[in-house]
Amino acid sequence: MSSILAVVVNDQLTLKYERDKELPEHQQAYLDKLDAKFEQGIELDGEFVPQPVLEERARYMALSLMEGILYQEDARAAVSLAWLATRLPELKQVKAHVDQDGTRFDLVFDEEYRYSAEVSFTGLN
């Protein structure tokens, strides 16, 4: 299990979830309520899914995460990220690309996020 779940939007680290930090009990209870709501079905890609499987739930929550980020709804993004991190312990990254054509994202299970920094050197000539 990866201890970090990274959210990368347009190649920039946007959010990260540290699985090593325990989720407070009231937040865990809220995620459990979300799971119960999923049992009633979800709308995904304009269609009602009466009994969503884990992959469909994950896609739904990843969409919610992206909307939370794009519309600066921090609570929505935080809940969505916590759900993904706790329900998919092997998930390493949510990679998204946002442009004028819309938002596309992938759930990445096989590649840890690598921190990188751009370093400029001046005066070396």
Task: State where each predicted segment sits.
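Short loop/turn motifs enriched for small/polar and acidic residues
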Residues: 97-99
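Compositionally biased, non-globular sequence tracts
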Residues: 1-81, 87, 106-125
